[in-house]
Every structure is written in C-alpha cells, then in structure tokens.
Amino acid sequence: MPRTQKNDNFVDKSFTVMADIILKILPTNKKAKEAFVYYRDGMSAQAEGEYAEALEYYEEALTLEEDTNDRGYILYNMGLIYASNGDHDKALELYHQAIELNPRLPQALNNIAVIYHYQGEKAKETGDHDGGEALFDQAADYWIRAIRMAPNNYIEAQNWLKTTGRMQIDVFF
C-alpha cells in the first residue's frame, strides 16, 4: 500500500492532498511526477522515524529524478537519516553529493560543519589536539559558506566562529 494511503495524521493528510493537487496541475512529465511521489513518501516515512522505508523511497526517487537541484534535496534528506543514525561518514558523502548537484543548500553546508565539529571534539577528547583543530578549521570553512548564503541563520555557528577567532570581520557582507 502506498504510504499516501496510510497517513492518519491531519498534517500528513493535508500535505498529501496538497501535493497530489500540485502534481495534477503542474505541467511535468510522468517520470518527474513519479519521482515526486517517492520523494514525498520518503519525507513522510522520515518524519515518522521509519528511516529504512524512507531510504527506499529516496533511492527510488533518485533513480527517477532528473532535475539536479531536486536530486540534491533527495541526497540531503538521505544524509539526514544517516547522520541521525550515527553514520557520519555516509552522511558526509551524501551531503557533499547534494552540494555538488545543488550548491544553494546552506543546510547541507551547516550539517557538514556540525559533523566536522563533532569529530573535532572527539579527536580532542582522545588527545589528538592537532587533528581536532584541523577538523574545527574544516567546520569553520563550511559554516562560513553556509552563513554567507543564509546570514540570518546559524547564529550559534557565528558565535563559535567569533569566539574561536575563525571568522573574518567582513565574512558575511
């Protein structure tokens, strides 16, 4: 049974109805519509914590989706799942692929920075000060890129950049 028939939550039902209406009126080809259905079902499964199911839907959406920006969003969502499951290497791989396809994804840049920062903290905890600092520098690079795209977001990252001396004064102008 398609996920769209299983939604019992009002918001999910509303989203599904709206998405179905949009799919019917937008002048897109059949393949693009199918890709969107899988993407929508993947988002629904992901929101419910059904990560394995969400990944299956996203994989199918990737095989059908031709638009590079949309493929970037699919890969980004897949990265979210892997990151939440602790597979940071796979998440980084997917976030980097997402940015290659859709460079206007500050949220992917932010998530890459968060992972590098986390890895830097872990490296320092194990006594690898230089490795930790190198990872912090990588995190800073990605946060700066994200903040340049979305200057009103990532306030904590901006504060971290300032307090660690990793931010140039004019970086966000």
UniProtKB/Swiss-Prot annotation:
One of its GO terms (cellular component) is plasma membrane-derived thylakoid membrane. One of its GO terms (biological process) is photosynthesis. TPR repeats lie at residues 35-68, 72-105, 120-153. Belongs to the Ycf3 family. It comes from the Bacteria. It comes from Nostoc sp. (strain PCC 7120 / SAG 25.82 / UTEX 2576). Transmembrane segments: none annotated. Pfam families: TPR_1. InterPro entries: PSI_Ycf3_assembly, TPR-like_helical_dom_sf, TPR_rpt, Ycf3/AcsC/BcsC/TPR_MFPF. Its main location: membrane. It is found in: Cellular thylakoid membrane. Essential for the assembly of the photosystem I (PSI) complex. May act as a chaperone-like factor to guide the assembly of the PSI subunits. This is Photosystem I assembly protein Ycf3. It is a peripheral membrane protein. Signal peptide: none annotated.
